[in-house]
Regions:
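Conserved donor-binding/catalytic core segment of Leloir-type glycosyltransferases
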Residues: 216-228, 234-262, 268-272, 291
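Helix-loop-beta element that forms the nucleotide-linked donor phosphate-binding surface
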Residues: 165-166, 171-172, 177-226
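N-terminal subdomain of nucleotide-sugar transferases
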Residues: 1-64, 278, 282, 367, ...
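Nucleotide-sugar-dependent
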Residues: 262-265, 320-329, 336-354, 364-372
């Protein structure tokens, strides 16, 4: 069931100045708009493949922009930045001009430069409703690599404030961000829309876990068992039954961008402590297999550091997981770790949302907005430093898997995660986001099948 105007589907444009495949929230917007009777033009850059549901939807058009020339990388850093921004501004503006005419445009921020001024100007000259989906502040991300008082950071902040106030309305990812937008910049017309996990993130059967472990064992020996139908975690009997091994190791999973704003050294030192504790008390702690997904500039540094340690009780692997296997991995794990530390302190990590959707408890590093998602000792664990993470891991896995104390102690975790999973994206979107689009289109609304 959806909304339809003037006996036809109204056009909406979604803009993200980034890889469309790495923009899950914008993919979700597109799917919900299509379900509610809109034609959607999703504008961004090519890269990883968008969600299969988006690719199959006949009412969603993907418009890819031409990336900036690689030659810009040979220029001095500041000049390269300005040239890239100029290129993106021109490409984005002409892409919008040549796209189907829309009644509403929703852009993702960040990045806000040049997206905000370009989208605002386009909406002015075409009389299009201008909406912003605030995921974070771009200037705080820029300040990570520069400094808080750098001129470019000031300009970025000024741009977000000026053009953010010109929007007709918008969405944001946390209550903390909504309050901050109002108090700091006087931006009032913003509605909170929390991220929710996609349907592909869900609990799985023991057989599905076994199939994943068998697949991983062909590449990573730490998963291999002592017979062809056995892994260190599971075993398939001749009659087809799959059981968990009584002496199985624990499986820890983390997804990281391998950048400075996700400090992997925190997990590295916690694992080093765990190695020592397991060596000293082998009867009380299981071996640990750690799967770290993602790619980034510091990946090679830390993988080399792990290799140098030659740990005997902790195995760390960094596989590239397909879009199909990643949700299965989360659902097969015993604990997730999130190292995301928000540059503004106001956004929430999508990776935790996905883990919760998979019924996986998470240990996450603390920052101001995090308790809006992770409730300490209710659906997850919050730590502030490497020492606290080390203690959490040791507490969580003590006696694992033979003793049931952990499962009994954290029974409420799984009950609360089941409650979290009941609240789906589209009903939340319909309540909080759909009215913004309905206000932006003309004509009498009616329900249509």
């Amino acid at each position: 069931m959806g909304y339809q105007r003037d006996k036809k589907r109204e056009q909406v444009t979604l803009v993200v100045l980034g890889d469309l495949g790495h923009s899950p929230r914008m993919n979700y917007h597109a799917l919900s708009l299509s379900e509610e009777g809109f034609e959607v033009n999703l504008v961004g850059f090519a890269g990883s493949k968008p969600q299969i549901e988006v690719l199959k939807d006949e009412h969603i058009t993907l418009t890819y922009m031409r990336p900036s020339p690689a030659a810009f990388g040979n220029l001095p850093r500041v000049l390269a930045y300005f040239m890239k921004v100029l290129w993106q501004a021109i490409i984005l503006f002409f892409t919008l001009l040549t796209s189907p005419r829309s009644k509403v445009l929703l852009m993702q921020n960040p990045p806000g430069i040049p997206t905000m001024p370009v989208c605002w100007f386009f909406c002015i000259i075409t009389r299009t409703k201008f909406l912003i989906d605030w995921h974070n502040y771009g200037y705080t991300i820029m300040a990570i690599n520069l400094r808080q008082n750098h001129p470019l950071v000031f300009v970025y902040s000024l741009c977000e404030r000026i053009f953010g106030k010109q929007a007709h309305g918008g969405l944001c990812v946390t209550k903390a961000m909504k309050i901050n937008l109002a108090q700091k910049w006087g931006i009032q017309k913003v509605t909170v829309l929390y991220d929710r996990p996609a349907d592909r993130f869900h609990p799985i059967s023991l057989e599905e876990k076994h199939n994943l472990f068998m697949k991983l064992s062909t590449t990573y020996s730490c998963f291999s068992g002592s017979s062809p139908d056995k892994t260190v975690f599971t075993e398939r009997y001749a009659d087809g039954r799959v059981i968990e091994c009584e002496d199985r190791p624990a499986l820890l999973v983390s997804s990281t961008s391998w950048t400075e704003d996700e400090d992997f050294s925190i997990l590295f030192h916690a694992l080093e402590d765990y190695e020592g504790v397991r060596h000293e008390f082998p009867d009380h702690y299981p071996p640990l297999i750690v799967v770290v997904t993602g790619k980034g500039p510091m990946k090679e540094y830390y993988t080399s550091l792990v290799a140098e340690r030659m740990w005997m009780h902790v195995a760390v692997i960094t596989p590239w997981m397909t879009a199909e296997d990643y949700p299965t991995l989360l659902a097969a794990a015993d604990l997730g770790v999130c190292l995301h530390y928000s540059s503004s302190g106001l956004d929430l990590p999508m990776k935790v949302v996905d883990m919760f959707g998979s019924r996986l408890p998470v240990a996450a590093i603390d920052y101001p907005a995090l308790p809006e998602l992770v409730k300490h000792n209710e659906n997850g664990l919050i730590f502030k430093n490497k020492e606290e993470l080390a203690n959490l891991l040791q507490d969580w896995f003590r006696g694992f898997p033979r003793e049931t104390a952990i499962k009994e102690t954290y029974y409420d975790f799984y009950k609360n995660l089941d409650e979290f999973r009941k609240l789906k994206w589209h009903p939340c979107w319909t309540c909080n986001a759909l009215p913004l689009f309905l206000d932006g289109v003309s004509g009498q609304q009616r329900l249509t099948n």
